[in-house]
Amino acid sequence: MASKDFHIVAETGIHARPATLLVQTASKFASDITLDYKGKAVNLKSIMGVMSLGVGQGADVTISAEGADADDAIVAIAETMTKEGLA
């Protein structure tokens, strides 16, 4: 299992466009990937799950992956978070 903590700096938080990009990135991997926020965990491959969290600016989230490609998944998601200016 691999995980990484992120502090969301984007003014709009994880809104529709970056959420879609995160879901697309996560969906490339076979591992189970979750986004944890305020004690609630959702499947990062589910746009509805990600949007339901309402992650805003200043939030601390953890992304965890479990499976054969977990480490690669975390690296790719971290790159997406940085590229999109989320964290």
UniProtKB/Swiss-Prot annotation:
Its main location: cytoplasm. Pfam families: PTS-HPr (PF00381). It comes from the Bacteria. GO terms for biological process: phosphoenolpyruvate-dependent sugar phosphotransferase system. Disulfide bonds: none annotated. Residues 1-87 form the HPr domain. The modification Phosphoserine is found at S46. Coiled coil: none annotated. The active site is at H15. InterPro entries: HPr, HPr-like, HPr-like_sf, PTS_HPr_His_P_site, PTS_HPr_Ser_P_site. GO terms for cellular component: cytoplasm. It is found in: Cytoplasm. Gene3D superfamilies: HPr-like. Keywords: Cytoplasm, Phosphoprotein, Phosphotransferase system, Sugar transport, Transcription, Transcription regulation, Transport. Phosphorylation on Ser-46 inhibits the phosphoryl transfer from enzyme I to HPr. PANTHER family: PHOSPHOCARRIER PROTEIN HPR (PTHR33705), PHOSPHOCARRIER PROTEIN NPR (PTHR33705:SF2). General (non sugar-specific) component of the phosphoenolpyruvate-dependent sugar phosphotransferase system (sugar PTS). This major carbohydrate active-transport system catalyzes the phosphorylation of incoming sugar substrates concomitantly with their translocation across the cell membrane. The phosphoryl group from phosphoenolpyruvate (PEP) is transferred to the phosphoryl carrier protein HPr by enzyme I. Phospho-HPr then transfers it to the PTS EIIA domain. P-Ser-HPr interacts with the catabolite control protein A (CcpA), forming a complex that binds to DNA at the catabolite response elements cre, operator sites preceding a large number of catabolite-regulated genes. Thus, P-Ser-HPr is a corepressor in carbon catabolite repression (CCR), a mechanism that allows bacteria to coordinate and optimize the utilization of available carbon sources. P-Ser-HPr also plays a role in inducer exclusion, in which it probably interacts with several non-PTS permeases and inhibits their transport activity. Belongs to the HPr family. This is Phosphocarrier protein HPr. It comes from Streptococcus salivarius. The lineage of its organism: Bacteria, Bacillati, Bacillota, Bacilli, Lactobacillales.
